[in-house]
């Protein structure tokens, strides 16, 4: 038997998506633009980082070759390694959305071939009858926001009014989401989570992918900050995923971070919560000591997207990548014969791009472990090849989509 470890560097795209123009993302390249900005000094921040982007361990896994495959150019200021010891390539997304569930479900062998529902860009985002039903079911005096917004901006703008009135802040984005921000102490965390459950139920006919609880603390617009108690309420995947097939085969899926929420806890045998990339890596390393033959350890490293991509923070994103790179030797030391690790992403979120939304990009594939031969696997037609590769490695039946690259 064998073990598999799947790490999603949330939003770490490598550009080059052939359908990017259809999404308004022609030229978006998360890795390439971060490297370009860092090489030009625009990725420097006092006390955080400076200079060209330094990712020696990821580079040794083929990251720069991946960038060349995906976008046609090497990242600025980064030197090719003397040798590559990982299997490497990039993948196109065939799901119609560039959102978190679509990316993760496709990675797990289930592309999203239908259109999500979205809320209008102009005017009130949410239908009046939906708002009325929410307020009635949840006994609310009303809601604030009702618009497309950046989460941090709307918190600064409406957080104090929320604390005065008790009305939750409800907003959306270009993704298929309904987000609800509320103060953990003034409104109450449990009350916020119950509200999200109500909204999730009411949104069934709207085909909205996720309801997201965004709890925060603080006492004024100057110091409001989100807490680690975010919760995602996703619709279930449209058909069984790799996780379901593993569970049916008697294997354990260790779902770390927001993986359980993304899959609506369908096929996720063991949910482990952690807040922030460092804590997520710590939890992952601990589980690597415990995982049995045949298990999958599946971790989402959310900070790249949540803290830096959406906030268009190049120095922050670069520093987070460099920190992750430094953790990789700890992963190597945990590996035993039969292990395979795959690093990938679910979409892009170019921190140099206009707006605050995800970007349509190819994603990297880096696979390594004892017995994994270093080579290029080229550009894959779908993220689902990742899930099929894990299925083949763990010895379970193939799914309907994708092809193993082992």
Curated annotation (Swiss-Prot):
EC number: 5.4.2.7
GO molecular function annotation: magnesium ion binding; manganese ion binding; phosphopentomutase activity
UniProt keyword Isomerase, yes or no: yes
InterPro entries xrefs: Alkaline_phosphatase_core_sf (IPR017850), DeoB (IPR010045), Metalloenzyme (IPR006124), Phosphopentomutase_DeoB_cap_sf (IPR024052)
Binding site for Mn(2+) 2: 305, 310, 358
Cofactor binding annotation: Binds 2 manganese ions.
Cofactor(s) this protein requires: Mn(2+)
Subcellular location: Cytoplasm
Swiss-Prot/TrEMBL GO biological process terms: 2-deoxyribose 1-phosphate catabolic process; 5-phosphoribose 1-diphosphate biosynthetic process; metabolic compound salvage; nucleotide metabolic process
Record bears the keyword Lyase: no
Pfam families: Metalloenzyme
Binding-site residues, Mn(2+) 1: 10, 346-347
Keyword tags: Cytoplasm, Isomerase, Manganese, Metal-binding
Pathway membership, UniProt: Carbohydrate degradation; 2-deoxy-D-ribose 1-phosphate degradation; D-glyceraldehyde 3-phosphate and acetaldehyde from 2-deoxy-alpha-D-ribose 1-phosphate: step 1/2
CDD domains: PPM
Described purpose of this protein according to its UniProt entry: Isomerase that catalyzes the conversion of deoxy-ribose 1-phosphate (dRib-1-P) and ribose 1-phosphate (Rib-1-P) to deoxy-ribose 5-phosphate (dRib-5-P) and ribose 5-phosphate (Rib-5-P), respectively.
Family note: Belongs to the phosphopentomutase family.
PANTHER family xrefs: PHOSPHOPENTOMUTASE
Name by which UniProt lists this protein: Phosphopentomutase
Gene it is expressed from: deoB
